[in-house]
């Protein structure tokens, strides 16, 4: 992770040399008054990728749970879509935590068994045992405009490469 004060252009006393980023800052436009749309991860990620407030989605508070459905609608463009349209190759690396269309062995989705909100840990654990980990996981970064993805949905999960869990 890199903080705001780690860049030489923002902090002349920074211990980390960032000559290329400093040059970009000098030659381009700098945004120095940013605000987070939320203090937690899911809504902030949603906002950065879509440019929309997360509270306009079906998530009205908190974060998505580990087997939750995709938060970004299939017809909604992300910054990755916009970059690809301009010829860029995009990658998403790290924690996604915006939901996926998790495949279950019985063909359903974990949310089919949950009325509202985050289920209790025992219920989540039970649902996790029914996930088909060998199938493609739809609705993640690859289906939302990114060319490449490597990361986890939530901490302590097996890594996902593209749209499949790794061993």
Describe the residue ranges of each PLM region.
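Formylglycine-dependent sulfatase
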Residues: 1-167
